């Protein structure tokens, strides 16, 4: 059974690469209902749209529709970019399938809580099996914050703190 069969999206060991400070900032900013820009590509043309997203364990989770252009584009090219709240990143888009399937139960329950303010406003049809969870596994990115520049790469000593006078936290995942 792979990760998609159990309704999770592994962030390419990115979480082991982020410093505890960077992870804390990611959770504070994105571990709730947040709007991010999601960019996909179709025939060498970028397409950007705002989506509601929730961050957990190196991945963003988004409720969307399987027949939407964004999912069609991700099926052709899973490489995506995101941006929001002083954060930019690349990742891999992965359709986890129907929101209501048993394998997605844990993340779906979290999304119901996180998106409680709008989830039942009629925009989503949870009886429709095309209502799906999109997972964006982060591969690399840049997080801006207060006073620290942290790099994370593939080396054994993955996190190095430098130049505390700057407001930059940076990380690189394994697929970069």
Task: State where each predicted segment sits.
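Short, basic, glycine/proline-bearing loop/turn elements
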Residues: 8-12, 48, 52-59
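An N-terminal domain-start capping segment
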Residues: 35-54, 134, 167-176
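Residue-level marker for the onset of beta-strands and adjacent loop->beta junctions
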Residues: 49, 78, 130-132
